[in-house]
């Protein structure tokens, strides 16, 4: 074989290997997606209504329903594991869980240690008013926020006074909440945007085939998310 033919042969071999490599991407180093087809999906649950809701029986919540449907598409069933956020994400980091859900967003510092899907739902927060009300300036105004909602900090940063309530739907004054909830309450959303969160689901580090499959599933649900959240709140 002369030098020209040798170079051509090497080039053809390299291209063939490149094509073969691309055909098998993305990969799961720990073969998580392949394993899930043969066993229950180990799902870490972090309580965070309406995303994950603890009940006396089967767990409920928007992300619980999403993962239940995703598992069904893969021909398996979820195996639920309750715990705190750090505990669950540490287990995920060491491949003891396959997925962790709990209203996580892309602001989590755990992105250095575990994998995440692409953001699948953007949750925007505004100040809103009951029908017929008007608000010129939020500064100095009392604004109701449900207890435990971190958006209260954003309200205070605007110079408003936060009133913490159990249920914002019973308030007859300015309210700060997610847009999907304000719409459900039939409140009028003002131009006072407070925050915007991108929701994600956590997976083990490096398991790219699993992330791709889950991303594809979540993409098909993107237009349903607002309605799913409103339905979950209506069940309370």
Residue positions per predicted region:
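Short, polar loop motifs at secondary-structure junctions
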Residues: 103-105, 130-133, 146-152, 178-182
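A ligand-binding cleft/hinge motif common to bilobed small-molecule-binding domains
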Residues: 102-113, 168-196
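Short, well-ordered beta-strand segments
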Residues: 42-46, 142-144, 175
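Sec-dependent bacterial lipoprotein signal peptides
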Residues: 1-22
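Extended ligand-binding regions for polar small-molecule ligands
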Residues: 23-25, 61-73, 132-156, 195-236
């Amino acid at each position: 074989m002369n030098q020209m033919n040798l170079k051509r042969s090497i080039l053809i071999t390299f291209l063939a290997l490149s094509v073969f490599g691309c055909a098998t991407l993305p990969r799961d180093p720990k073969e998580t997606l392949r394993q899930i087809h043969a066993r229950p999906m180990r799902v870490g649950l972090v309580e965070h209504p309406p995303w994950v809701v603890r009940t006396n029986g089967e767990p409920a919540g928007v992300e619980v329903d999403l993962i239940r449907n995703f598992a069904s598409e893969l021909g398996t069933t979820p195996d639920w594991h309750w715990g705190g956020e750090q505990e669950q994400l540490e287990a995920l980091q060491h491949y003891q869980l396959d997925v962790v859900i709990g209203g996580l967003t892309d602001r989590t510092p755990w992105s250095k240690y575990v994998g995440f899907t692409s953001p699948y739902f953007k949750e925007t927060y505004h100040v809103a008013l009951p029908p017929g009300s008007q608000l010129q300036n939020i500064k100095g105004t009392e604004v109701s926020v449900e207890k435990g909602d971190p958006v209260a900090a954003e309200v205070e940063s605007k110079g408003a006074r936060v009133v913490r309530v159990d249920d914002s739907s019973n308030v007859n004054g300015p309210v700060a909440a997610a847009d999907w909830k304000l719409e459900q309450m039939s409140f009028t959303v003002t131009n006072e945007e407070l925050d915007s969160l991108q929701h994600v689901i956590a997976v083990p580090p490096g398991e790219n085939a699993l992330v791709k499959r889950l991303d594809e599933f979540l993409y098909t649900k993107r237009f349903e998310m607002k309605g799913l959240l409103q339905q979950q709140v209506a069940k309370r």
